[in-house]
Amino acid sequence: MKYVGAHVSASGGVENAVKNAVDIGANGFALFTKNQRQWVAKPLSEKSINKFKELMEEHGFIADGVLPHDSYLINLGHPEEDKREKSYNAFVDEIRRVEQLGLKYLNFHPGSHLKKISEEECLDLISENINRAIKDTEYATLVLETTAGQGSNLGYKFEHLAYIIDNIEDKSRIGVCIDTAHIFAAGYDIRTKEAYEKTMQEFDEIVGFKYLKGMHINDSKAKFASRVDRHHSLGKGEIGIDAFKFIMQDSRIDNIPLVLETIEPEIWADEIKLLKSFENV
């Protein structure tokens, strides 16, 4: 069983994300629990929280199939302490929101060194802040996302994720999300069966499938190993459709959210149907 959906809008209240997921025939989804381009947001209302939980139950969604994403502003590895602290406080707020909604995961981009400190120093700061955040919150698993390596973003090598995980004290609360467009742009090929197996074996050896808590399912406008982050609709980009068949037929990827962040929301329902059609081939 795979939880297939898209990153749906929660505009007008988090409960609307559930309705939007239902509308596209999803059995999993991603959402922002607040405006992703603002540092501070009003707390979630009791009414919104209850309605969200009610709709989740009514439509048969479970927490295992939902992958909330934090704000793009947050940088846990920021070289400047005051800005890092601002990011940390926003991150903890995001985790608490997820926990209020009864969800399990918070997906986030590891962080950026902004060309002011070394990669290792930045990875140490990220690890330190994750450890702090785990102590300051209750139970949610914090899910590091693979990145394309654009600019000074870390997370474009499996080794970056492994380094962070190694430094986490409570490993039951850390995980990883593979974004297909990002890994492809970072130089991990998945276009043929052989390339896919090689990349997944590398992931397993360096990070470990036990840490895989979700995937972002995207084709790529950017060329292989370009270190450029540009998503495309399935089969229309540089990756091609076969990679998504391999994913849907891979039992190591069962029971986690597979979330579309492709560029044409109007065809998400079709893309979900397409992915599900690959599952039992």
Curated annotation (Swiss-Prot):
Catalytic activity: Endonucleolytic cleavage to 5'-phosphooligonucleotide end-products
GO molecular function, a single term: DNA binding
The keyword Nuclease belongs to this UniProt entry's keyword annotation: yes
Keyword Nuclease: yes
Bound cofactor: record note: Binds 3 Zn(2+) ions.
InterPro entries assigned to the protein according to its UniProt record, in alphabetical order: AP_endonuc_2 (IPR001719), AP_endonuc_F2_Zn_BS (IPR018246), Xyl_isomerase-like_sf (IPR036237), Xyl_isomerase-like_TIM-brl (IPR013022)
Residues where Zn(2+) 1 binds: H69, H109, E145
Enzyme class, UniProt record, top EC level: hydrolase
Residues bound to Zn(2+) 2: E145, D179, H216, E261
UniProt-listed Enzyme Commission number(s): 3.1.21.2
Keywords, in A-Z order: DNA damage, DNA repair, Endonuclease, Hydrolase, Metal-binding, Nuclease, Zinc
Cofactor(s) essential for the protein: Zn(2+)
A GO biological process held by the record: base-excision repair
Source species, domain of life: Bacteria
Pfam families: AP_endonuc_2 (PF01261)
List of residues binding Zn(2+) 3: H182, D229, H231
Function: Endonuclease IV plays a role in DNA repair. It cleaves phosphodiester bonds at apurinic or apyrimidinic (AP) sites, generating a 3'-hydroxyl group and a 5'-terminal sugar phosphate.
Family, per entry: Belongs to the AP endonuclease 2 family.
Record-given protein name: Probable endonuclease 4
Naturally occurring in which organism (per UniProt): Nautilia profundicola (strain ATCC BAA-1463 / DSM 18972 / AmH)
Gene: nfo
